[in-house]
Amino acid sequence: MSIKSDKWIRRMAEEHKMIEPFVPDQVRAAEDGRKIVSYGTSSYGYDIRCADEFKIFTNINSTIVDPKNFDEGSFVDFKGDVCIIPPNSFALARTVEYFRIPRTVLTVCLGKSTYARCGIIVNVTPFEPEWEGYVTLEFSNTTPLPAKIYANEGVAQVLFFESDEVCDVSYADRGGKYQGQRGVTLPKT
């Protein structure tokens, strides 16, 4: 299994629509010149952006977080260019990009150091072979202070690994529960 380069990422995005919308280079500044958290194609990965749809954890209903019986009332929906995550709290978002992962590919997604150095941890599970959809992003604010997440800017990097043989059963073959997800998707069992 080998990591894939910027050339491969560009080719797969342009010829097979692996990433839409696709940014072939790394963007480090907004059109007006202000600095942003970078996104787009890097040497051996793709820096994904966060859309402007968020679900922020709240304790209004004082429920227990149960992944088998998740209470949607545990979140407050928010739409905007900047999401403020309360201290020691958590938020969900989704990517701007829609992904179509080839059958021979598995991805690993890692948070960007810009956020990690501020105590904001980004968690995303691997994109499995033949999975497709918008990625649900998980943000943990590990600090005792409120923390900002910027919509339409980079939040994590996706690394693409290609196997030397095709898997017997892909995510699509087994009817994965998050296949084709569109918005911020809550836990399913």
From Swiss-Prot:
What are the record keywords, sorted?
Answer: Hydrolase, Nucleotide metabolism, Nucleotide-binding
Pfam hit, one: DCD
Positions bound to dCTP = K112, S113, T114, Y115, A116, R117, T136, L137, E138, Q157, Y171, Q181
Quote the catalytic activity from the record. Answer: dCTP + H2O + H(+) = dUTP + NH4(+)
Give disulfide pairs as residue numbers. Answer: none
- What is its pathway? Pyrimidine metabolism; dUMP biosynthesis; dUMP from dCTP (dUTP route): step 1/2
- For this protein, the Enzyme Commission number is 3.5.4.13
A GO MF annotation of the entry reads: dCTP deaminase activity
Q: Which GO terms describe its biological process?
A: dUMP biosynthetic process; dUTP biosynthetic process; nucleobase-containing small molecule interconversion
SUPFAM superfamilies reported in the protein's UniProt record? dUTPase-like (SSF51283)
Q: Does the keyword Cell membrane apply?
A: no
Record-annotated active site: E138 (proton donor/acceptor)
Query: Does the keyword Methyltransferase belong to this entry?
Result: no
Taxonomy, superkingdom:
Bacteria
The UniProt similarity line reads: Belongs to the dCTP deaminase family.
Annotated function: Catalyzes the deamination of dCTP to dUTP.
Q: How does it assemble?
A: Homotrimer.
| Name used for this protein in its record | dCTP deaminase
